[in-house]
Amino acid sequence: LFGRKQRYFMAVNDISFDVYPGETLGLVGESGCGKSTLARTLLQLIKPLDGQVVFEGSDLTQLPHSAMRRLRQDLQIVFQNPYSALDARMTVGAAIMEPMQIHGKPQSKEAQRQRAAYLLERVGLDANAMHRFPHEFSGGQRQRICIARSLALQPKFIICDESVSALDVSVQA
């Protein structure tokens, strides 16, 4: 067997910023510079080796899993690749309602269905799309579904990881 030394690459180093309610912050950088890694670290999908991620006064890196799970309703992400972001076995409606069911917001199934239909319409899709599966949609339509899903819980903070790259050029602006 041949062995290789494990090498570590510092994707994000010495970064600090504040984002206040109502503000938008854009990160720009070349491919591979760590933008997606930073996004995943902010949401604690990747644990940082050092430093803090503070949201509403709490250091997310120090929170137990149960507390972080409760906070996830306020922290959402729209991933870059809509093809891998949706479960192919779930209808679009089920995918949008899943975070609502996990967090019990709204409480009734009917209210969740109505919210999912409303969100689909808000992103330019017909409410009847709820009964279809992800493979029945184009990449741009799937990305709209992912955007609708990220809005389902009315989060306080949304990270968009190149979320418009899969949308039609006419919609990107």
Segments and roles (model prediction):
Residues 1-173:
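ABC transporter nucleotide-binding domains
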